[in-house]
């Protein structure tokens, strides 16, 4: 009896297995009979029926913007399921190839979307042909991608140029510079030593020491300006005790100078200390900017250059703002260059250079110049300073 039950269950299990397998096979055959969607009932999109979507053609309502029709059929395509044609978007236009302009980088702008696409921009993209390219040094910010509010590289730089006029006055009633060493310390030329050179003078009967050695005091602080000023050696016009006058001006003759000497060689090594005024214009009476204190030395045998070292102190900062200069001023050249050696106040750690130009002229009433308002010899230096920090 037990054996019959086991045999019955085995037969039942086999029957169920066969039935299930047959059902699975029937389902697979049914799935395979479902027809694939084809495009035969409806015409496919054709080539050449509309222009390719370009920039600025209007707002896009589908995947992309375009002006041509999606297909050449008689009716609009619908959304079908099953054996019908492929499903398409009803109201939007499909991008199809056409005879229109291809979106390439060239004379036209890159195609951009004016719709609400992520990252869309109404400005010109960098690299578009007809739009403005973000260039260096144009001064205008880019209008497309990457535009910022900062300044463009290569724009204008801050102006650190400073211009002032220095008035150097030697001699006269109010000199601002004085020669302290060199030729003015030569007692033989200043008439301080008797018999500085043999001149045939006879001793006085009173056994006194003769004070006149026939040089008539060639050099003093009133005629040295004609030789050692910042304007350079101008002439051999000197001042004496009233002898050798020419047109009201004293003249030195060859017998008044030591043998083998020239005016330029006599001035070599002369050091002049200065405390000159700095003004806004070339006139001495123009706006006062400050003071220039320092010295210059006649450093050329031919008298054509002065080695200068001075500090320009400006009144606006209570004379706390200053710039120091050092260099060679060539009086025979149209302009010279001095180096900026530093500064104080707002000019601390200043670097750069100065271009120096000379305005010269005789003082007094005989050859009065527009920039001269003194009875001494005035030399005006125009200093254009270029600074960097």
Swiss-Prot record:
Region (Disordered): 50-135
Any one GO biological process: phenylpropanoid biosynthetic process
Gene3D superfamilies: Allene oxide cyclase-like
Keyword Signal applies: yes
Signal peptide feature range: 1-21
Pfam family, one: Dirigent
Keyword Cell inner membrane set for record: no
One annotated Gene Ontology cellular component of this protein: apoplast
Superkingdom: Eukaryota
Subcellular location(s) of the protein: Secreted, Extracellular space, Apoplast
Keywords: Apoplast, Secreted, Signal
InterPro entries named among the record's database cross-references: Allene_oxi_cyc_Dirigent (IPR044859), Dirigent (IPR004265)
Biased composition (Low complexity): 50-68, 77-86, 98-135
Principal subcellular localization: secreted
Subunit structure: Homodimer.
Similarity remark: Belongs to the plant dirigent protein family.
Protein function: Dirigent proteins impart stereoselectivity on the phenoxy radical-coupling reaction, yielding optically active lignans from two molecules of coniferyl alcohol in the biosynthesis of lignans, flavonolignans, and alkaloids and thus plays a central role in plant secondary metabolism.
Name of the protein this chain belongs to: Dirigent protein 25
Species in which this protein is naturally found: Arabidopsis thaliana (Mouse-ear cress)
